[in-house]
Design a protein with these regions (language model features):
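Electrostatic cytochrome c docking/interface patches
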Residues: 22-55
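C-terminal capping alpha-helices of c-type cytochrome domains
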Residues: 91, 95-96, 112-149
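Short pre-active-site segment immediately N-terminal to redox-active cysteine/selenocysteine motifs
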Residues: 55-59, 135
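Sec/Tat signal peptide C-region and signal peptidase I cleavage site
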Residues: 16-20
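Sec-exported extracytoplasmic/periplasmic mature domains
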Residues: 53, 86, 98-102, 141-148
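Bacterial N-terminal signal peptides
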Residues: 4-15
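Domain-scale selection of a single, long terminal region
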Residues: 1-6, 28-29
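Gly/Gly-Pro-rich "capping" loops immediately C-terminal to redox-active cysteine motifs
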Residues: 41-42, 51, 61, 65-99, ...
Length: 149
């Protein structure tokens, strides 16, 4: 449990918060998914890959491994991102990005698009999401391309 707290603290301490002037967009959860885009438009998979691999923004590789041969020291705490698009729909990926605790209250994965009900929030992140709605959609678009061979 102590390791989990350290990982979450590291995630929150190293990422840059989304723009403060962006309002949290409403979304609807159906089952285990958010079926509709947060922005109303599809994300950009190339931008999504850059966010996933960015150790200052998404920090995904702190916990996950994936198809990033150029990135050293990938995490082993969470499932591999390889094949994510085969395992989950875009809506399921979106809910995991927005607030994975809706599916697993004990997860160490941070809520990338939530501002309420959080603990130990760094001052720089108060009232802000970790990623913008557009960035969430970019990551979802990229992860959806990761199909099993």
């Amino acid at each position: 449990m102590r390791l989990c707290a350290l990982v979450v603290t590291a995630l929150l301490g190293l990422t840059a918060p989304a723009q403060a002037d962006e309002e949290l967009r409403p979304f609807m959860i159906l089952g285990d998914a958010i079926p509709e885009s947060l922005t109303g438009t599809p994300g950009d998979p190339a931008k999504g890959r850059a966010i996933v691999a960015n150790r200052q923004l998404g920090l995904c590789l702190l916990c996950h491994t994936g198809p990033f041969p150029e990135e050293r020291f990938q995490g082993t705490l969470s499932p591999s991102l390889a094949g994510a698009g085969s395992r989950w729909s875009a809506g399921q990926l979106r809910l995991r990005m927005v607030d994975a605790q809706r599916l697993n209250p004990d997860t160490i994965m941070p809520a990338y698009y939530r501002i309420g009900g959080l603990r130990r929030v760094a001052r720089a992140f108060e009232g802000k999401t970790l990623l913008s709605a557009g960035q969430v959609e970019d990551v979802v678009a990229y992860l959806a391309t990761l199909k099993d061979p």
